[in-house]
Amino acid sequence: MTALPSAYPEASSQMPAAAELACRMDAARLAEELSSVSVVSWQKQRTHVLGLDGESELGTTSPPTELEWRVLPLWSIGGDADRTDPGGPEDKGYAPTIWWSRLPCMREVVSAIPVPFNSVRLMALGPGASSDEHCDPKYDVRRGFCRLHIPVLTNPDAILVLDGVRYCWAPGELWYGDFSRLHRVENRGAEVRVHLVIDALMTSDLVQLFPARFRQSFEDHGALFNSFGLACADCRPWAHPRKFAIPRSFLNFTDDAPLETSEPKLSVELHYSDRNVYMKTVNGTVLAMTPVGDSRFRFSGWSDQRTVVVDDGSIVLESRFGHDRRTSRIFDQVDSDH
């Protein structure tokens, strides 16, 4: 995915692009466990559609890559073992796949990292495979996301080039990379390169594993730390669907500035049903929502970067990027039936 133009100041280039975190894994155990699923047919990597662009519907996935780049998902949207994409806002949240219970060492390793994780995937880059240079804007700590890598198998000729710097991370290490910057991967070796890739929500606890200079940089540039701990049952319910016309771009999750008032509007409904909260668009797309505060919700599969506050007679749309916070109050559309 290529970055879209942003209305926010560009600061990520001033932050370090990668860091080894203060956490080491048992590389031999990881490799041994990997061998137990090496005979399984891994599927090719796909990407996830994050925007309502008029052509591709939010929540759909791309065709499989032509590269020899295969995935075994351990956590995915709905726990679907066929989902090789990283996922995002959809009608359900993330859940373990059948492979999660069958790989106890990897389960232990991932669970020990102090983050709530979304997608967890084993990703295998075959010999001779190489990607085009690209960037993934989602994985910017100012958006509240981070992507972590634990190499399991590698070779000296299997590399990542991130922000112009060449990396070959060793098995058992835990690395953070700012994949919102330009990067590419290639494997010129004779052996497959396998990484355990964890897409997580940024937290203040995770930051403690970073080198000191990163911790200061995150503070300076407004890394977004997410909120947790509430259930929908803890929130004040509403009896009938709430109807609003919101900027269409608010549901384009590739857009860093989704609250422009000149944007075309999209009719949506907010539902509270059986202690579940979701947003439904006029074309039937359903997006599950998670509480992050009293009457404040984020989209499942997303971060606190984009939230909805439910008030009496209105909602407040919030968008954050680093230190920048933008809001827009939208009033209910009157429904004569209620």
What are these regions (language model features)?
Residues 1-109, 220:
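Non-heme Fe(II)/2-oxoglutarate
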Residues 122-141:
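Conserved short histidine dyad/triad with adjacent acidic residue
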Residues 124, 141-157:
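Short, conserved beta-strand element in jelly-roll/cupin
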Residues 132-133, 158-160, 177-178, 182-189:
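Short beta-strand His + acidic residue motifs that chelate non-heme Fe in jelly-roll/DSBH
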Residues 146-151, 176, 190-207:
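A short hydrophobic beta-strand segment most commonly corresponding to one strand
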Residues 151-170:
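A short beta-strand-loop-beta hairpin characteristic of the jelly-roll/cupin
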Residues 275-308:
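Contiguous, well-ordered beta-strand patches that form the walls/edges
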Residues 296-338:
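Beta-sheet ligand-binding and adhesion/scaffold domains
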